[in-house]
Amino acid sequence: MTRSDTRIAWRTGWIAGAVAAAAFLLAAAGTKAQEKPATPWVAPADARAVKSPLKKTPDNLKAGEETFKENCEVCHGPKGDGNGPTAKTLTIKPANFTDAALMSKETDGSLFWKMSKGRGAMPSWEDQLSDTERWQLVMYIKTFSEKKKE
């Protein structure tokens, strides 16, 4: 290899490294721009006032648990603590349903509205799950903070 070849190889390597570093920095900057603090997610007053039409029964809780496992656990985790396998990839972290202070602010109606409408990575479930399935899910989600109190 001649001296000229060595210089060309060195320049090519240096340029490739600089391009890779610039691409990494641009990607990181783009990610940081998306990591704005989440604005509070509050259901409208009329939605908050809605009461569940279902009674808390073992069958409804079991159905809610199954729906949770099939649709929610991947983000909210098996314990409902917001630490599901995909949670670390999300900019806005999933709700921690074991947090009694957080859950005390949520009415049945607000939880139903939030899961129906979705936001960001949280999908809207109103076209995928029936009203009954979503109310059963609300019922089950509330058990996570109740378990923590015990």
Regions found by a protein language model. Give the residues of each.
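Electrostatic cytochrome c docking/interface patches
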Residues: 36-67
